[in-house]
Swiss-Prot record:
The keyword Endoplasmic reticulum does not apply. This is dITP/XTP pyrophosphatase. One of its GO terms (biological process) is nucleotide metabolic process. The lineage of its organism: Bacteria, Bacillati, Actinomycetota, Actinomycetes, Mycobacteriales. It comes from Corynebacterium efficiens (strain DSM 44549 / YS-314 / AJ 12310 / JCM 11189 / NBRC 100395). Mg(2+) binds at D72.
Length: 207
């Protein structure tokens, strides 16, 4: 079975491949957007992660005829009333400028004391089939925000985010950008949402 992942982010494809391998699901070939003929990029104008994930997955399925998986994710900061939320990737104005997004967020919460620097990464993953079936799952990852970026393994807001699981271990305060890929898979918001979709993928693959 071919499964289009509506992204060109190699780290996202790698994460899903590792999760499928761990679940023992075989005969699923993951394709990135670069592997299929280009089609008009859908406008992500949803007001929720779920709406945006479905917009991307529906566009992939309708334009390519392939079962399509898409995710929409972001960071919800308690002190900012849940923002940047669905605007996370373009918080500083330009889509995908991690440095600018991190700098702006740090400036906005500079005066927030440690006990109020809570945040959560949220990911909604959606699968849409060409015949219109839809599967949607959400994952959340709670933690706190640092005052400066630490680590080089992740992307987005990873260098600012200390997972709750790390905070509970005395002497450990690693950011999610300091975790190994395997550690992040086990804990992350996207990992949780993707694992919740494994039964649907297995069903679609006839396993």
């Amino acid at each position: 079975m071919k499964l289009l992942v509506a992204s060109n982010n190699a780290k996202k494809l790698g994460e899903l491949q590792r999760i499928l391998d761990q679940a023992g699901i075989e005969n699923v070939e993951l394709l990135a957007l670069a592997d299929v003929p280009s089609y008009p990029e859908p406008v992500e104008d949803g007001r929720t992660f779920t709406e945006n994930a479905l917009i991307k997955a529906r566009a992939g399925a309708s334009n390519t005829g392939l079962i399509t998986l898409a995710d929409d994710s972001g960071l919800e900061v308690d002190a900012l009333n849940g923002m940047p939320g669905v605007l996370s990737a373009r918080w500083a104005g330009k889509h995908g400028n991690d440095q600018a997004n991190n700098d702006l967020l740090l400036a906005q919460i500079a005066d927030i004391p440690e006990e109020h620097r809570g945040a959560a990464f949220v990911s909604v993953c959606a699968i849409v089939t060409p015949d219109g079936r839809e599967f949607v799952e959400e994952g959340r990852w709670h933690g706190t925000l640092l005052r400066e970026p630490v680590g080089t393994n992740g992307f987005g807001y990873d260098p600012l985010f200390v997972p709750m699981e790390e905070s509970l271990i005395e002497g450990r305060d690693r950011s999610s950008a300091q975790l190994t890929a395997q550690e992040k898979d086990a804990l992350s918001h996207r990992g949780k949402a993707l694992r919740a979709l494994v039964p649907a993928i297995a069903e679609l693959a006839g396993q």
